[in-house]
């Protein structure tokens, strides 16, 4: 059975965002991750693609530490790819 339910990521109390986990978004994310040599710029682009520009701007205004931003990014990738946070974290920390 097909489901159009979108995963949600909760950043703080009252700050929840639906993750766009469509096939087209995943294709754009994969392309961005492969083509971009700047890891931070690629992470920003993924957040924009998966959560939308408004959510990205709200998150930017929070001035998260890099460690927290990485946690957010891994959570988004887990939601997009329908994997557990731990699986994505393991892959993210493994050099390619």
Describe the residue ranges of each PLM region.
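Short, surface-exposed, charged amphipathic helix/loop patches that serve as local interaction elements
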Residues: 2-6, 12-96
């Amino acid at each position: 059975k097909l489901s159009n339910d979108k995963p949600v990521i909760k950043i703080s109390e009252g700050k929840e965002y639906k993750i766009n986990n469509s096939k087209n978004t995943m294709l754009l994310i994969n392309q961005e991750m492969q083509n971009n040599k700047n890891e931070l710029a690629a992470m920003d682009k993924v957040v924009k693609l998966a959560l939308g520009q408004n959510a990205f701007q709200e998150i930017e205004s929070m001035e998260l530490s890099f460690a927290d931003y990485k946690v957010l990014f891994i959570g988004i990738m887990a939601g997009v790819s329908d994997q557990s946070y731990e699986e994505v974290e393991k892959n993210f920390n493994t050099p390619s």
